[in-house]
């Protein structure tokens, strides 16, 4: 059933938080290659580029940037936090329906007392040749706008092998009759805010706690092409045995991250 538009008493006090982790997986055979991958991914997702992505996110959703704090770290990693504010807006003009959010050159929305932040975590292990890159992103808003409108754009910008997403609505707001409302928009699944092309690229599963207004979606890239996971190595340079070993190693790593548990080796 579609929710009726609420006439609120004062400001909308609901807090809506969207957080997600994206993972990029790579195989680097030698220590030099592992160091090279970490240096490459650290440069690709340095503080300046992350600031550009988050600033574009603010532009898409129509937020005013109040302050930007950014930092690159040694030996690797970066963080960016942007505080944003809302422009005057009529809540009746806000689209709260359940559908994919905008990409660049699309609809704008507005935020208040809100922030967008990202932290990156490159890592590798000397045994096995596996390297992973994780970016944690959070978009938290107060008011009538759902940060889910930014989800579509951000995942397109940070295309990765695995994505885990959490969305939660906290607090309550009152209508003019004093009745408390703990959510002000319809949502059955985070997936409903994703574009069809994104859905076709990933296997997904939901774990939702509707009565607590908590929603969780996991995404695992469907298509696997080994050449996209090798750093400074070509698949044709591998023996059939090495090709299979590395493929199995990468798939095991991706499944473990997707399911959030270690998978015992067979045999």
Swiss-Prot record:
Gene3D superfamilies: S-adenosylmethionine decarboxylase. Its EC number is 4.1.1.50. GO terms for molecular function: adenosylmethionine decarboxylase activity. The active site is at residues 114, 119, 142. The record marks 113-114 as: Cleavage (non-hydrolytic). Binds 1 pyruvoyl group covalently per subunit. This is S-adenosylmethionine decarboxylase proenzyme. The gene is speD.
């Amino acid at each position: 059933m579609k929710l009726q538009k609420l006439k609120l008493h004062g400001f909308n006090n609901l807090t809506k938080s969207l957080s997600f982790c994206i993972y990029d997986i790579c195989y680097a055979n030698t220590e030099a290659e592992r160091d090279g991958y970490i240096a490459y991914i650290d440069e690709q997702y340095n503080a300046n580029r992350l600031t550009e992505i988050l600033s574009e996110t603010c532009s898409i959703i129509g937020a005013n940037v109040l302050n930007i704090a950014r930092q690159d770290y040694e030996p690797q990693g970066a963080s960016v936090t942007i505080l944003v504010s809302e422009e005057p807006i009529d809540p009746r003009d806000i689209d709260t329906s359940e559908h994919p959010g905008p990409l660049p050159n699309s609809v704008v929305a507005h935020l208040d007392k809100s922030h967008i932040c990202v932290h990156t975590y490159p890592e590798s292990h000397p045994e096995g040749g596996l390297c992973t890159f994780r970016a944690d992103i959070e978009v938290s808003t107060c008011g009538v706008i759902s940060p889910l409108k930014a989800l579509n754009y951000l995942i397109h910008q940070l295309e990765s092998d695995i994505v885990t997403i959490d969305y939660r609505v906290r607090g309550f707001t009152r209508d003019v009759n004093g009745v408390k409302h703990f959510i002000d928009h319809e949502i059955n699944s985070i997936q409903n805010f994703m574009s069809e092309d994104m859905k076709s690229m990933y296997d997904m599963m939901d774990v939702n706690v509707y009565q607590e207004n908590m929603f969780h979606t996991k995404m695992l890239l469907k298509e696997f092409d080994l050449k996209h996971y090798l750093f400074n190595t070509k698949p044709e340079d591998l023996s059939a045995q090495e090709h299979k070993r590395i493929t199995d190693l990468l798939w095991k790593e991706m499944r473990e991250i997707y399911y959030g548990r270690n998978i015992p080796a067979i045999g």
